[in-house]
Each structure stands twice: as C-alpha cells, then as structure tokens.
Amino acid sequence: PYIGDQSYFDTTYKGLQLVQQELGDKVETKLIEMGTDAAGWDTAYRQAADDGYQIIISGNFQYESYMLAVAEEHPEIKFLNFDYSDAKANSLDNVYSITYAANEAGYLAGVVAGVKTESGIVGCIGGVDSPGIRQFLAGYMQGVYDVNPNAKVISGFVGGFGDPATAKEIALNMHKQGADVIYHAAGGSGNGLFEAAAEANFWAIGVDADQYASMSGKPELAKHILTSSEKKCDVAILQSIKLMLDGKAEYGTQKTLGFVDGAVGLAENENYKANMTADQLAKVEEMKKKLAAGEIKVNDQLKDDKAYDTWLDKVGLK
C-alpha cells in the first residue's frame, strides 16, 4: 500500500523486489502506493484491476475489505492477500491468503524483554486497538511471563500507525512508571518509541523488520533498539508468488506461517549480541527451541478474543 514506514510495508516491498530479481524472466512488477487516505483505496484497487495485472498483491487489515470487493468482481485476476484478518471473507476462489503468527513474534519480543529488564517493569505499545495488534501484545505478555513471572507490563495504544509524536509521549510515560524495555507493534508510529528511548535512555524493541538496521541512518536512535520481532514478509511473498505461478497455490484457503516456518523471528544483529549477556542469550535460545519443538503454545487473540485482557489482568502493572 505504501513504503517508507521503515518497518512492515518496507519489508513487503522488499518481497516485490525479490520477485522481480528472482522471477524477472517470468513477471513484470509495479509498485502502486495508495497512501494512508482511505478515500483513494477503492479507486487504486479498481485501477490496478483495469490495467490488466494478472496478480495483485496486497495486505493489512485496513486495506483488506477494499481488495476483496475488487477480487469478487474480477474472478479472472489472482490476488495474494498477505497478513489477512478475516478468514471467511478470504474464501474466494481467486484469493490466496497468508498471515504470520504475530502472537509468536510478540512472544519472542517478550522473552527478550523479560530477560533484559532490570526494573522488572516493561512496556508494549500498539498502533490501534484491534485483534491483530492485540495478538502481538498478548503474545508479548506471555513471553515476558514465561521467563520472568514477577515482571509487570504496561500496555497502551497510539490510535494510528503514523503518529510517532503520540507514541513517544506514551513511551516516555511508561518509562516514568519504571519500564526499561518497551516493545511496539505500531508501524510508523513506533519511530516515536525510538526517539523516547534515545532521549530517556532505555531499551526499545522494534517490529516486523530489523529496525536497528532500518534506522542505521540515525545511529543515536538505532543504538537503543535492542532487537526487533520480525515478520519475514519479503520471503513469504516470494514463496507465495512462486506457488501461484506454478499453479500450486491453494486459493480460497488461508495459511498461517509461524516461527517453525521461518516466517517470524528475532533480529539477532550485532547490537543485540553486544548488549545481551551470555546467560540472557542462552535463555532466549532455550525458549526459541521450545517454541520450535511445539513445547510452548502461544495464546492467539484471533482464536481467543479475551487473550489480551486475560494477560493484562495477570501481568499488568496495577
């Protein structure tokens, strides 16, 4: 839908670039930026359909209904919906839907926060209060608890994905309450968390992409990004397009990709390794192995709509 958020959508754009690089002899690709103004989204999808594209790639719950409306009217066009939210609505014969286990991504971030905190208080910030974002945060709280059951969590929502000023204000307030590690699942708003972390000297955890790397142009901010939970949208998009081109995509179905699939994980870059002790790194590795082996079942907000509230009641700072 657009690029420049240094997170989710930039990673998905890398997926389109991978498609062009690896499959350029079979396909021609084009990026269409729809922006953040919903007034133009329907027109953008219809224009793409009218322009004769055989496959349209789109994702994110905010855009989903617009894409599906056009998909229903154009059965001759194939659609890849990455990060779907409504399984029933995606059961169209020309739509292949994938999503990522955001609960597992959040869980891994929570494990890091739980072993890293010195104050025993950590935070998490969501972009909007939606099931998909609550899925990240509920997983985060479970991860914190599993490695540090006495830790407390402060949670809050920005109200949008393009409001770093509000995210910064929320993060600074959390830090004043004692949070020394704060995670975000807030898209472009999360840049405000990084500003707060640099200003008040605490640790931030990014989302969807290696945000330490994506913020490398601002080293004063990047050095406070301990790690990021990653949705490896780029690889998943490339794999999905290959299936579609080979006629192997299961249209009308929805596939969830998790840690065991290599679709979500942690950014274990030099900043992460330099600022975690050997014991902390070992604990994270232990929990990753348990998750991969199926020994840990992460709560799923999309299957249990009380998961976030249950965990906040259990570990929330009173």
Locate each region found by the language model.
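A residue-level marker of the well-folded mature domains of exported/periplasmic proteins
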Residues: 1-318
